[in-house]
Swiss-Prot record:
Tissue and organ expression note: Expressed by the venom duct.
Protein name, per record: Alpha-conotoxin-like Ca1.1
Transmembrane region(s): none
Species in which this protein is naturally found: Conus caracteristicus
Modified residues (Pyrrolidone carboxylic acid): Q47
Location of this chain's protein in the cell: Secreted
Length: 62
């Protein structure tokens, strides 16, 4: 393989690595946002549950 061909392969590998890394970061941001939304919903549900006596006894709200 010539020097020019090796440099081209190197650039393609760097580009592919960058694309994979960028899309992985974007996907993890989406998962984090979904997890944060779920945590918020669970917190609100628990706060509402603590105002109901039968639910309060079941889940031991403090």
């Amino acid at each position: 393989m010539g020097m020019r061909m090796m440099f081209t392969v190197f650039l393609l590998v760097v580009l592919a690595t960058t694309v994979v890394s960028f899309t992985s970061d974007r996907a993890s941001d989406g998962r984090n946002a979904a997890a944060n939304a779920f945590d918020l919903i669970a917190l609100i549900a628990r706060q509402n549950c603590c105002s109901i006596p039968s639910c309060w006894e079941k889940y031991k709200c403090s």
